[in-house]
């Protein structure tokens, strides 16, 4: 379902987004 797709997308993007968030904090 949609949530499964969103979950996999979030898992894929998290490693790229986390360092950016860490830099801003």
UniProtKB/Swiss-Prot annotation:
The keyword Secreted applies. GO terms for biological process: defense response to bacterium. It comes from Ranoidea xanthomera. Antibacterial peptide, that adopts an alpha helical conformation which can disrupt bacterial membranes. Each caerin displays a different antimicrobial specificity. Coiled coil: none annotated. Contains two amphipathic alpha helix regions separated by a region of less-defined helicity and greater flexibility. Pfam families: Caerin_1. This is Caerin-1.7. The modification Leucine amide is found at residue 25. The lineage of its organism: Eukaryota, Metazoa, Chordata, Craniata, Vertebrata. Caerin-1.7.1 does not have any antibacterial activity. It is found in: Secreted. GO terms for cellular component: extracellular region. Expressed by the skin dorsal glands. Keywords: Amidation, Amphibian defense peptide, Antibiotic, Antimicrobial, Secreted. Belongs to the frog skin active peptide (FSAP) family. Caerin subfamily.
């Amino acid at each position: 379902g949609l949530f499964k797709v969103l979950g996999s997308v979030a898992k894929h993007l998290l490693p790229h987004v986390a360092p950016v968030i860490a830099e801003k904090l």
